Amino acid sequence: MRYKESLLLPFLLAINIILPVTAQEKPRLKIGGALRFNYNYSDWKPESRNRGGEFDFDVLRLNVNASYKKIDLAVDYRFYPSSSGGGMLREGWIGYRFNDSHRLQIGLTTVPFGALPYTGNNYFFNLNYYAGLEDDADMGIKYLFHKDRWELSLAYFQNADLSGTGGDSELSASRYAYDIAGRDKEAHQGNIRVVYHFGNLWRHQLGGSVLMGGLYNMDTRKTGLRTAFALHYVADYRRWNLKMQYTNYNLRPVRAPGEDRSVVTMAAYGSSYRIASRADIYTVSLSYRIPVNKWFLDDICLYNDFSLLNKRVAGFNDSLENVTGCSLAMGKVFTYIDYAVGRNHAWLGDVW
């Protein structure tokens, strides 16, 4: 199979409004948002080649952050085109700050797994994202501890963000992050993430993450097992940044006799596809930031992000993704310029 290539230029305009309220307790409200457009040229699509690419609306984002005494509130809502799932809540939680080291969040909150917030630097994310193991938020409760050089996150998630479906209804594909869909549902998931920081001139981060939860099958009404673990390393030296992560996942649904258990359906952005039920994921991302601070340009970040999904299922071909590009920061405007190459990749191939 030949490699599929895509050139993407997303343009992001961000707006923030901070509204401090003058009162004795000093509640605080911050309203923000962004409007993003994409230019995309996909070499495997004849219509894209013939027209010289496509320039489209991507997303309108609304952010609300508020705090009062020790209570925090965070909301991130996205408005995508109907073909990409339409409106969806990316994150929405209420939190309590016991002190500077201990915090609690309840609601649709980010799953603590791997290098945060992302293993890469580009618009496309790395392959972890497409396996539901990066930039994902689920419904549950999360405890966060951060003191000196240590970070600890403990979380329990009752289920994925169901988007109004329940019972025997299949998971809606109108969602921001990839979750298990089809006749299987995520249930009763636990997460542990531990990170240690060290170094001064060279700043290092070593971390480990564990995920364990159920896979409820609506046909057999039995719960299988979902497990994943990751080891990550992040290094910063002056303008350089290096991120590396190894991830292993194993999905074991309990399906009716004769049904294929080697694949599991994932859904997001109004569409779904299948992934191997067992795999290792390797990611390496390197970036270099150049401060400019002249005219309209603040800085440039050059990067290369590579990820490989090694499928541990007989007869399956591995998937890979490599994105070379840069991001441009221009005040409230942020632009990615990415050259993406993929093989056996749902978003970089003939599926879409």
Regions found by a protein language model. Name each.
Residues 9-16:
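Bacterial N-terminal signal peptides
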Residues 25-42, 51-163, 195-199, 283, ...:
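Outer membrane beta-barrel
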Residues 29-35, 73-75, 104-106, 152-154, ...:
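Transmembrane beta-strands of outer-membrane beta-barrel proteins
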Residues 38-46, 78-83, 113-115, 120, ...:
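Sequence/structural signature of outer-membrane beta-barrel proteins
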Residues 48-52, 121-127, 169-175, 224-226, ...:
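Flexible, surface-exposed loop regions and adjacent strand-edge segments
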Residues 196, 200-312, 320:
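Detector for outer-membrane/organellar transmembrane beta-barrel domains
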Residues 330-352:
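Predominantly the C-terminal beta-signal and adjacent terminal strand-loop region
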